[in-house]
Design a protein with these regions (language model features):
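Bacterial Sec-dependent N-terminal signal peptides
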Residues: 1-10
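Conserved small/polar residues in nucleotide/adenosyl-binding loops
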Residues: 200-202
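Entry beta-strands of beta-propeller and related beta-repeat scaffolds
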Residues: 68-72, 142-146
């Protein structure tokens, strides 16, 4: 005798309201939520010479650990898929006053001669772009780690998230504000410890 039971998909969060956003506007033309505040943590300026000189800054990710807010975001000189890319970090004790940005994952050189499967564009003096969707991890032992992803864009219509990037990286953020070394956590299929450069310990 065979017994079969009907499987049901897990119920997921879904929006049941009638108000829709207008995607032609960065704020969606939605009313602000009562009690929320918009805090500018840095101002980009191409005339600067430091970490704020690159004007494409996005994908902010926020963590709260050890009585401190940590804000990680990725940065490019002018556009999302225009190398080089880097990831920066800011900290705050109150959420209003923020430290100057520091580079936590620096620009990374793509090996010369690299070609993506099925493509013709070849890397020559090229740098990776950052393209992570997860910025922090807190371990069971209460340690904080920053994560990032080095993707590759070799042409105008290339995609850094096509599975042909270099790989995911990780480094520890210590309680005193210092950083541990950068390690590759996971390589994509074309890369390994033999054909990747050691990352700078900054």
């Amino acid at each position: 005798m065979i017994l079969a039971s009907a499987l049901q998909a897990q119920d997921t969060v879904r929006y049941t309201g009638t108000t829709l956003s207008n995607i032609d506007y960065h704020h969606g033309q939605l009313s602000p939520a009562v009690g929320t505040h918009n805090i500018q943590t840095m101002r980009a300026n191409r005339a600067d010479t430091g970490a704020t000189s690159w004007t494409y800054n996005h994908a902010p990710m926020l963590a709260y650990w050890n009585n401190t807010f940590y804000l990680e975001y990725l940065s490019d000189p002018v556009g999302e898929h225009i190398p080089p890319g880097q990831t920066l970090l800011q900290t705050s004790k109150d959420g209003y006053n923020w430290s100057n940005p520091v580079v936590i994952f620096p620009p990374y050189k793509v090996p010369d001669g690299f070609v993506k499967p099925g493509k013709k564009d070849t890397a020559k003096n090229a740098y990776a772009v950052m393209h992570q969707r997860m910025g922090f991890y807190t371990s069971k032992s209460k340690r904080l780690f920053a994560l990032a992803f080095y993707g590759i864009v070799l042409g105008q219509k290339d995609d850094p998230n096509d599975g042909n990037g270099i790989g995911r990286v990780i480094r520890e953020i210590n309680a005193d504000g210092s950083f541990g070394p950068i390690y590759f956590l996971r390589y994509n299929h074309s890369f390994n410890e033999k054909n990747t450069l050691s990352l700078i310990h900054i």
